[in-house]
Amino acid sequence: MKPDFKAIQEDKEISLLIEKGNEVLKALGYTEHSRRHAAKVSQTAGEILEKLGYKDKQIELARIAGYMHGAILAYGILKERGMALEYALTISTAIGHHDEKTGTAIDPVSAALILADKTDVRRNRVQNPNQAQFDIHDRVNYAALKSDLIIDREKNTIQIKLEL
C-alpha cells in the first residue's frame, strides 16, 4: 500500500485513539493534542517539505507522521492496514524521535514533523484552567494569539512569526 494521508485521516480507529489520548492529556492538564492539532501538524509538515522541493512520497509520509505523531501504536496500525514496511518505519521512527527532550531529526520526514509540531502555537491549545499550574508549553501557547510559518526555499530558512 502506498502512503495515503486521506485514508489515515478518515480512519475511525486512528481518530478515536487521537481523541482518547487528548482526553487523558486534558485530564492531566496538558496542552491540547486533538484531531485539530494533528491536522495542523500534518498540514505544516507537508508544507515544509513541499516548499523545500521534496518528492510527493516524502511529503505524504510527513503528513501521515504529523497526523499520527501522538500515536504510540502507529507502526502496528500502519502495518495492519497494509502499508509497506519502508513507509511504516519512516513514519513511526519520525514519531518516536520528535520529542524535544530525547528526539533528533534523522531524516527530512522527522525534521518536518519536529518543526510542524513545535510551531502549532496558539492560546486555545491550553487545556489547563489553572494559570498558576501552567507548564512551559502552556505559558508559550497562552501568550500566542497566532502563529505563522514562513518557509523560504531560496534562502534555505524557516521562520516562525508569533502574534502575542
PLM features per residue range, with description:
Residues 1-71, 76-79:
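Acidic/His-rich, divalent-metal-binding segments that scaffold phosphate/diphosphate chemistry
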Residues 2-4, 84, 152:
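Serine/threonine-rich low-complexity intrinsically disordered regions
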Residues 9, 43, 58, 127, ...:
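Residue-identity detector for glutamine
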Residues 82-142, 146-147:
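Histidine/acidic-rich helix-loop-helix segments that form or flank divalent-metal centers
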Residues 147-164:
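Short, aliphatic-rich beta-strand segments
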